[in-house]
C-alpha cells in the first residue's frame, strides 16, 4: 500500500504510520482521479492540526498542484465533517502561504466555500478572511456572489451580512436561473427560520423586484409557511407590508383559505385579527366556512361564525353537512357525523339566527336535527316578538343595539336554557361585571364627596344613570384615577 492508498482506505490515520509513508512517497503526486494524497487527506473526517503540520513539514504545495480539481483551502473549507476543526486547519494553511483568492479548476473560491459551510461561517472567521485580503466580488460556477451564497446556508447571522456589505459585496445580485433577488433567495432557503431583522435589512438596502412578481412571490412564500405550520408574527407583519391580507393568487385563494385547508390555527387567528375576509370565494366555489366544515375543524368553524357570514357561504357549508348526513350509511360517515355533531348544530343555530332562508330546503339536515331545528326557530321567533321599549330581545341579544342596559336582564334571562343560552349567559356575565364596577364607582364617589357635596343630594338612580353612560374603559380609568 502506498501513501494514496493509506489515506484513502485507513479507518483512522496514525501519526507514526503517516510519517513513515511521507518519508517515502510524494504527497503532491497526481493520481488518475485528478487528486493528490494531500488533497484526499483534506477530505477526511479525522484531519488534525498535527497531521496537517506533518504534511506541511514535508513541503506540500498549499495552493495545490496543477491538474487537481480544487485548491486545498477550498477542500478544507468545504469539509463539513470536520466541524469547527476546519477553521483551525484553514488558518494553518493560510499562515503557511495558501492563497485566499485561489480559484480551483472547478471554479470555486475559498470565500464562497466558507460561506456555504454553516459549521464555520461565523462572523469572526469571515472577518478573518476579509482581513487576509479575500475578494468579495467573486462569483461561483452558479453565478452566485458571496451574499447570495451565504443566505443559502443554514447559519445566517445579521452581523455577518453587515461585514460582507461593508467589505463591498454586492447585495443586488439576481438568481441566474429564476431571476430571484437576494431577499427572495433568503426566504426560499429559510421558509421555517426566517429572521425578520434580516428581511428588514435586505429590504432596507433597496432589494426589490417588479411589484407584480414580488406580490406573487410573497404570496407563494406565505402559502409555504402556512403549509409547514410555521408561525412568526413579526415575519407575517413584514410579508403583509408587501401584500394585502385579502390578496388572491391565480386560483383566487386568499391566505386565510390556505390556513383553513392546512388547519393552521395560529395564522388563521392572526389573519382574522388583521381583517381578512372569510367570505372570499375561490375558483372552486369554496369559502372559508365550507372548507372548515369539510375539514371537520370545529375551532375554525366556531371562530368564523362570530364573523359576518354571507348567505351564500352559509348555503355552501350547509350543503356539505346535508351531503354528509345523506352519506351516513357509507363507510365511516356515521362516526364522522356523530363526532362533529356539536359543530353542525352550532352552524345550524347561527344560520337560523342570521338568514331569512329556510332550513327546510336541506331535507337531510332537517330530518336528522328536527327537534333542534324546531327549537332554534321557535326561540328566534319568540325573541323577535319579545319587545321592550320598542326594542326586540333578538336585537338586544345579538348585538344590534348600541348598549345592553340593566333593565334587559330580567327579560333575556328566560332564554338562558334555550338553544341560544350560551350567548345569553355571556351577555349576563358581562352585565353583572359591569354592574359591579358601576356600583363600586358610585359608592367610591359618594364616600369621596361626603355629605355636603351636590353628588350626594342626587337621587341614587340618577347617580347610577350618570355612571352607566360611561363605557367600561372609562369606568376603570376613573376608578383608578380617584383611587390613586
Swiss-Prot record:
Identify the SUPFAM superfamilies for this entry.
Ankyrin repeat
The entry's protein name is: Ankyrin repeat protein T5
UniProt entry tagged with the keyword Repeat: yes
Record bears the keyword Translocase: no
Which cysteines pair up through disulfides? They are none
Concerning InterPro entries, the annotation shows: Ankyrin_rpt, Ankyrin_rpt-contain_sf, PRANC_domain
Entry keyword set: ANK repeat, Repeat
Organism of origin is Rabbit fibroma virus (strain Kasza) (RFV)
Where does the record place its ANK repeats?
Answer: 33-64, 68-102, 106-138, 142-173, 178-211, 251-280, 284-313
Q: Which Pfam families match?
A: Ank, PRANC
Q: Where does the source fall among the domains of life? A: Viruses
